[in-house]
Structure formats: structure tokens, C-alpha cells
A protein has these predicted regions:
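Feature captures the catalytic ectodomains and active-site-proximal regions of enzymes
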Residues: 1-102
Length: 102
């Protein structure tokens, strides 16, 4: 959150990714507890167009965070890439009209 506050203004960074590590120096390991701090898109995106057409915009994984929740009609966060594939397949089996964005 501190990095997001600092990286604003004229030269703002669109997305800050904070990923905690565990372990000792020389043996750090990444955790899956990543957090994204994104700015909303400055202009309409394809997602806006889809949503304005009364279609679904389903975000699987970090998509909701990447777009700062803008225009996402439904979202599910995943634990890893394979979970993302599985969740995408689950959504494909449901009655959806629109975009499944993984």
C-alpha cells in the first residue's frame, strides 16, 4: 500500500505487485500470497465494451486485480496456473455469454 501511494502522480506506475517471500537470506522462496495494487484503466477497454453490451466479463486468477475490478462482472482468484486452467474449464461448462478472461 505504501508503494502504491508513492507511485502516483504524473509518472504513476499502473501496477504494483507485492509478493511476500519466506525463508532466510540466500534461501528465500516466493509465496502465493501476492497482492496487486493497480490503477484503473485511464480509458475504456474491450472489457468496458463487452460489459456495456450486457455480456459477462469473468476474471479468472489475477484479472480482477489487474483491472482494479473495473468492468469485471464475476471473478474467482486462483492458487496457481493449473487452478486457473481448471476454473476456466469450469466456467466454460456453465451458461455464460461474454468473455472468460484468464
Amino acid at each position: 500500500e505504501i508503494a502504491r501511494e508513492i507511485m502516483m502522480g504524473e509518472n504513476a506506475v499502473a501496477r504494483i505487485i507485492a509478493r511476500p517471500f519466506v525463508g532466510k537470506p540466500g534461501a528465500f522462496e516466493r509465496t502465493s500470497n501476492r497482492r496487486d495494487y493497480s490503477l484503473s484503466p485511464f480509458e475504456d477497454t474491450v472489457l468496458d465494451t463487452i460489459k456495456k453490451s450486457n455480456l459477462d466479463v469473468i476474471g479468472v486468477g489475477k484479472i480482477e486485480d489487474i483491472f482494479n475490478k473495473q468492468c469485471i462482472t464475476e471473478a474467482i482468484h486462483t492458487k496457481d496456473n493449473m487452478d486457473g486452467v481448471d476454473q476456466t474449464i469450469n466456467y466454460m461448462k456453465k451458461e455464460n455469454k461474454g468473455l472468460i478472461f484468464t
